[in-house]
Swiss-Prot record:
This is Dysfunctional anti-sigma-K factor RskA. GO terms for cellular component: plasma membrane. It is a single-pass membrane protein. The gene is rskA. Belongs to the anti-sigma-K factor family. The chain crosses the membrane at residues 91-111. It comes from Mycobacterium bovis (strain ATCC BAA-935 / AF2122/97). It comes from the Bacteria.
């Protein structure tokens, strides 16, 4: 199996875990996983497990089903022609849908409450200019789903090892007149097999970069850039 095919198989882990594939597609994926090299099969199974654990947490917090338009977004993203257009689009949309459910805290059983305003995740997913980009980060991946129109984005980190104790991952918005701007920090306890964060005020930034910084973070990047995701 070529490296390109391995990546194509790994990107199917999220829709597989969310049951967003047909029975025939599931059987085909099972055959491909069985025939894949051991590291690829292990990575696929780890991703499926992480997604299902995330959804289990969401289900424990609310009995509501995800909004219909998010389910549609997942199914649309899993179509073969869409997968060909963007290697990472399927996983990013499916993971972002899980974020939307978790952040939205939908309580459809309480009908007397007024409709809540759209969550950040919903605003990004429904934006006409929504885009996704993903890059390796250590042994895992970092994906950003973002909208310039909404000036915000969603970060999804899968299977990224936590930083060493006494350090943090620090995310930086690069570009623009102000130079690097800190967007978020994550310590050891904050990084799990499936980690999410909201990115606000993208402004004129052209990329999101990751470094490891001492203590609780730095005013400016001091560590080596571990990954850089273009936001153009």
């Amino acid at each position: 199996m070529t490296e390109h095919t391995d990546f194509e198989l790994l990107e199917l882990a999220t829709p597989y875990a969310l049951n967003a594939v047909s029975d025939d597609e599931r059987a085909d994926i099972d055959r491909r996983v069985a025939a894949a090299p051991s590291p690829v099969a292990a990575a696929f199974n780890d991703e499926v497990r992480a997604v299902r654990e995330t959804m289990a947490v969401v289900s424990a917090a609310t009995t509501a089903e995800p909004p219909a338009h998010l389910r549609t977004a997942i199914l649309d993203a899993t179509k073969p022609e869409v997968r060909r257009q963007s290697r990472w689009r399927t996983a990013a949309f499916a993971s972002a849908a899980a974020i939307a459910v978790g952040l939205g805290a939908f309580d459809l059983g309480v009908l007397t409450r007024p409709s809540p305003p759209p969550t950040v995740a919903e605003q990004v997913l429904t934006a006409p200019d929504v885009r996704t980009v993903s890059r390796p980060l250590g042994a895992g991946t970092a994906t950003v789903v973002f909208s310039r129109d909404r000036n915000t984005g969603l970060l999804v980190m899968n299977n990224v090892a936590p930083p060493s104790r006494g350090t943090v991952y620090q995310m930086w918005l690069l570009g623009g007149a102000k130079g690097p701007r800190s967007a978020e920090t994550m310590g050891t306890a904050a990084v799990t097999p499936s980690t999410t964060a909201t990115l606000t005020d993208l402004g004129a930034s052209t990329a999101l970069a990751f470094t490891v910084e001492p203590g609780t973070g730095s005013p400016q990047p001091t560590g080596t850039i571990l990954a850089e995701l273009p936001l153009g």
